[in-house]
Amino acid sequence: MANVYKNAFFDPTTTAAETVYTVPSNARAIVQNIQLTNESGSKVAKVSVTDSSATTDYQIAYADITGPTICNVAKGPVVLEENDVLKIESSVTSGISGIVSILEINRE
């Protein structure tokens, strides 16, 4: 069993939910930080998780960000299971970006 720290970056090209990170089929993951940066103006970001065991999307964070500012929308650790998907949706296609800090736990 190996623990690996990873970063997943977010820089939207569409206003639809975009996959930022997918948990490998042989691992679990703990999301420790979801940091979003708004360069200017007012933007909305939504964070969701697709639970692969139930094929259901759950919104886990919502941020109305007036820039310029940086905010962390993860208010605590988020545990993801095998094949779960973390997605971020933005109200605009530019001026907002971010990073997700993840501890991936390989179960092999």
Predicted regions and their residues:
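C-terminal interaction-tip segments
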Residues: 1-33, 37-40, 46, 90-108
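Surface-exposed loop/turn positions
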Residues: 27, 69, 82-84
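Short, surface-exposed beta-strand/strand-loop-strand elements in extracellular ectodomains
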Residues: 40-63
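Short proline/glycine- and polar residue-rich coil/turn motifs
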Residues: 63-70
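Exposed aromatic-hydrophobic patches
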Residues: 70-77
